[in-house]
A protein has these predicted regions:
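Nucleotide/phosphate-binding catalytic cleft detector across ATP-hydrolyzing
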Residues: 1-157, 176-191, 211-309
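Active-site-proximal alpha-helical scaffolds that flank and shape metal-associated catalytic sites
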Residues: 160-164
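Short, acidic (Asp/Glu-rich) active-site segment that either coordinates a divalent metal cofactor
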Residues: 167-171, 181-182
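Acidic, metal/cofactor-coordinating or nucleic-acid-engaging core segments within structured domains
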Residues: 200-203
Length: 309
């Protein structure tokens, strides 16, 4: 069984599921009706409070448990019955392009776990799985693959994947990667959230959550006072301006280049990017699951090329 998981610092995505990269661990069920997993005699529930940024997600067990949630949600979606017989899984994952060479081997082994059988309970259902193969792909390029039919018409374009903590930038020529520009910057929307929250607390003694900031950026109804809203908008515009200048220093001029924006951060910032009129040709990949779906397309292409099943 093929299961594709995009491990974001802000959220976990499969082709069909989306949830925050946050966990609470306890010794027993808490009595609330929430998704849970019992594994290794511990209970894990999802929370909207995301995990602090980890450049190397193999440092502890949390992203492994989040992956069990992702697998369980896909099994549930596909109506796979609970079973004590191990389900063999080929797991498709991704990493920022600039981190790929350094981290991909460790990342794959983290999930492979010597192909051991893993038993767990998900929302009262019992599953047994064995991750028999793990394949990793570059994020951003995977998202671009889902739009290859459109991108191959452009002689040069830049895919800009704005995630939770990283922004990945990849140059494309006729839809194919040009390794002259492969960058991953630790300047994702979590850094914006942290900056806004810190300044708001200092100036107005208010504690903001990510969702409070999202409401203002998206022009949604909010209970925040006007001065806080203005602070959020000003700092978000400054964040984008700084990012555009950062790109320009690296040879990417958004005022003259075709820029293809992907990732949840791009969708969050879309309105401000478009209203700012600093990006001449913005194209948005609206599917937040694009990387996860792209891993599947890349895997299918490899299978077809190798004549494997």
């Amino acid at each position: 069984m093929i299961i594709s998981v995009d491990h974001g610092n802000k959220s976990i995505k499969t082709p069909n599921a989306l949830f925050t990269s946050g966990l609470i661990v306890s010794e027993g069920l808490q009595g609330f009706k929430t998704d849970y997993i019992c594994w290794n005699n511990k209970y894990y529930t999802l929370t909207e409070q995301r995990i602090a940024y980890l450049r190397d997600k193999t440092e502890d067990e949390r992203f492994y448990v989040l992956t069990l949630f992702a697998i369980a949600k896909e099994l549930e979606r596909r109506k796979v019955p609970e079973t004590l017989d191990p389900i063999d899984i080929t797991l498709l994952v991704g990493l920022p392009p600039a981190h790929y060479e350094q981290l991909h081997s460790r990342f794959e082994q983290y999930f492979l776990r010597r192909r051991e059988i893993v038993d767990f309970e998900y929302n009262g259902k019992y599953y047994s799985i064995r991750v028999s193969k793990v394949l990793s792909y570059p994020q951003a390029f995977a998202a671009a693959v889902t739009q290859f039919g459109t991108l191959k018409a452009h002689s040069v374009a830049y895919i800009i994947d704005i995630g939770g903590f990283t922004i990945d930038v990849l140059k494309l020529r006729s839809g194919h990667p040009d390794l002259a520009v492969v960058e991953s910057f630790e300047k994702g929307v979590i850094t914006l959230y942290n900056g806004i929250a810190s300044k708001c607390k200092a100036l107005y003694a208010r504690i903001l959550e990510d969702c409070d900031i999202d409401e203002v950026i998206r022009n949604q109804p909010t209970v925040l006072p006007g001065e806080v809203q203005q602070l959020i908008r000003t700092m978000t515009n400054d964040f984008l301006t700084e990012f555009y200048n950062f790109l320009r220093e690296r040879g990417v001029d958004v005022s003259t280049s075709k820029c293809v924006f992907a990732g949840g951060g791009s969708l969050l910032l879309r309105g401000m990017i478009e209203r700012g009129n600093k990006v001449a040709f913005p194209i948005f990949i609206e599917d937040i699951h694009a990387n996860a779906r792209g891993y599947e397309l890349l895997y299918q292409s490899e299978v077809a090329a190798n004549g494997q099943q």
